[in-house]
Amino acid sequence: MDLRTPKGTHDYGPRECYLLNRFLRAVTEVFETHGAACIDTPTFELRELLCNKYGDESRLIFDLADQGGDICSLRYDLTVSFARFLAKHRVQRLKRFQIGKVFRRDQPSVSKGRLREFVQCDLDIAGAYMEMVADAEAICIMSECLDRVGHRYQIRISSRKILNALMEHSGIGRNNFATVCSTIDKMDRLPWADIAAELRTKGLVDGQVAVLKRYVCVSGGIEVIDTLRSGELYLYSDGKKGIDDLALLFKYLGIYGVGDRAVVDLSLARGLDYYTGVIFEAALVDFKDVGSVAGGGRYDNLVSSVLGKKSEWSVPCVGFSLGVTRILSVMLKVDRRRTTETEVFVGSSGGLLLEERMGVLSRLWRAGVAAETFYTRKYGYASLMEHVRKTDIPFFLLVGEKEIAENRFRLMYGEDRALQMYGDIDTIVNFIKSHRAGQRPPAGL
């Protein structure tokens, strides 16, 4: 029997799951700090819901076989499902997060975290608020999540409204906006010559390509906004609105303390049809080959489009997705070797002492300390220590007949577990908890 996983999918072993779950716990804490609530939606949706939402990316949707009844497809992202949720339940204001698998019929690259099945983690703010307030908080939350990754990153920010003005200024018909944006969005991974060639295949002439190049190659800080305000795009209504939005957004990002991590980059287009305003994307500075690890933007019309063309009920939204699988691919390259949350390994000396170790484990567990031992035959001290080092368990507690008789156990910790302290179980628990909290050990230890 062929035991391969299908192309573009991946098994997650203990180490992968440990790192993945640790990161998801960290970002969930960030979301909840900002008052977000969790929801969940089906893994597959009615096919008609997903149609015409993703531009050129629609070809990547996995369609399920027609078995009679509903015609369904696997979800491409979590955003369209969220819009359906808002529309179905008539929710007008909600700050929500959701974690789940999504599916794309893409050409996979496991080494770069590009798969056909992968985990996404979304945060969205739905509702009408003052200009750019929700957008700024969404980018702030995304920044706080990326802080948990522990590597340098940069956030690129653009605006669909500015891009609309650029298309109009370039003489590009509105029916070509989406496909041209999809090509421009590849600039972070393709040279300009390839971008220009692809634009020409979509019907653009050399003059139009030249105008696009003059703007989409612009990148920088607040000075770019000042330059745009004095340029041709500011004369268009969409251009003026988009540029003024960016100016206000960067003001708010400065207040939140994340403005220094963001740049204006008009090559950022994000190829999805539903974006209407600010768009943003983040990449790890030292792992550019992985691609973007987070991205999102404002989508004010998606909920009404889900309800149908005649609907007047709408909910403006802004949000982002974390590319969890791509982030995991980076963590696997550089992170330490832990596979569990175990804090203490309980070993024995001078005998098997299984029941005695079980008693110690029980007390540690009840005290809220993650601990484990071997339930098989007796292992030598060297083998136990090798296991502790290999799995990066920070503490090694030794149980022997003398320790049991005196109720005084030896705890080894630090580099190569070379440091030691002695005490009863309560004292050891307090020491471990103080170490966990980054505090100085209690006096006398």
UniProtKB/Swiss-Prot annotation:
The primary site where this protein sits is: cytoplasm
- Name the Enzyme Commission number(s) assigned to this protein: 6.1.1.21
* Name the UniProt record assigns to this protein: Probable histidine--tRNA ligase, cytoplasmic
UniProtKB keywords: Aminoacyl-tRNA synthetase, ATP-binding, Cytoplasm, Ligase, Nucleotide-binding, Protein biosynthesis
Q: Which GO terms describe its biological process?
A: histidyl-tRNA aminoacylation; mitochondrial translation
UniProt lineage:
Eukaryota, Fungi, Fungi incertae sedis, Microsporidia, Antonospora
The family database entries (InterPro entries) matched by this protein are listed as: aa-tRNA-synth_II, aa-tRNA-synth_II/BPL/LPL, Anticodon-bd_dom_sf, HisRS-like_core, HisRS/HisZ
Q: List the disulfide bonds.
A: none
> Which Gene3D superfamilies has this protein been placed in?
Anticodon-binding domain (3.40.50.800), Bira Bifunctional Protein, Domain 2 (3.30.930.10)
Instruction: Offer one Pfam family short name for this entry.
Output: tRNA-synt_His
Per the record, the similarity remark reads: Belongs to the class-II aminoacyl-tRNA synthetase family.
> What superkingdom heads the lineage?
Eukaryota
